Each structure stands twice: as structure tokens, then as C-alpha cells.
Curated annotation (Swiss-Prot):
GO terms for biological process, alphabetical: mitochondrial pyruvate transmembrane transport
Family (UniProt): Belongs to the mitochondrial pyruvate carrier (MPC) (TC 2.A.105) family.
Membrane-protein topology: Multi-pass membrane protein
Function field: Mediates the uptake of pyruvate into mitochondria.
Protein name: Mitochondrial pyruvate carrier 2
Species in which this protein is naturally found: Arabidopsis thaliana (Mouse-ear cress)
Domain of life of the native organism: Eukaryota
Coiled coil: none
InterPro entries: MPC (IPR005336)
Length: 109
């Protein structure tokens, strides 16, 4: 039974013999790096980089559900990219705008 499942995976149109398997698998490295950057101070986060990560994730989530064969590895990695990009952008925006607003209130008060 396990052999037949492994053989089915091996021979799948998006299986390990194709770029449709390896491209999203290596793309997980970007999401993992973005998760590792959660510890990075918000002032070091790049708006352009995180916008690119977020947009790429959103665009390819949609495309991964349309293409044949359905590639759930591609879909899941792009959900992770969009989610981590949105989180990093939220951290940066809070740091740049909420922190400045709080500092201005403290100076006025």
C-alpha cells in the first residue's frame, strides 16, 4: 500500500520528477526566511521587499488553483508568503506610524 502511494506521488504530474514540485518546495525558503525575520527590529524591514513577497503570494495563490495539474504545494507556499508579508508590513506600519503618533502625543502632553 505504501509503495503504491509513493509510486503515485512519484508519477504525479506535479510530483518530484517535475519543476512543479521543486519550485514551490524551494520557495518555502523565502517564507521560512520571512518567519525568521519576525525577530528582526521593525526599522530594518523593507516596504518594497514585503510588498513584493505579499503580492507574489496573492497572485500565485490564485494562479495555483487555476493551472493544471492542481498544485497544492504551490498554493500553500504562496498562502504562507502572503501571510508572512502582510504580518511584516503590519509590523513596519505600526512602527513607522503608530510609534510616531504616540511620540507626538507624549511631546505635546
Amino acid at each position: 500500500m505504501a509503495t503504491s502511494k509513493l509510486q503515485a506521488l512519484w508519477n504525479h504530474p506535479a510530483g518530484p520528477k517535475t519543476i512543479h514540485f521543486w519550485a514551490p518546495t524551494f520557495k518555502w525558503g523565502i517564507s521560512i526566511a520571512n518567519i525568521a525575520d519576525f525577530q528582526k527590529p521593525p526599522e530594518n524591514i523593507s516596504y518594497l521587499q514585503q510588498i513584493a513577497v505579499t503580492c507574489t503570494g496573492m497572485i500565485w495563490c490564485r494562479c495555483s488553483t487555476i493551472i493544471t495539474p492542481k498544485n497544492w504545494n504551490l498554493f500553500s507556499v504562496n498562502v504562507a508568503m502572503a501571510a508572512t508579508g502582510i504580518y511584516q508590513l503590519t509590523r513596519k506600519i505600526k512602527y513607522d506610524y503608530v510609534s510616531e503618533a504616540e511620540a507626538a502625543v507624549e511631546i505635546e502632553g
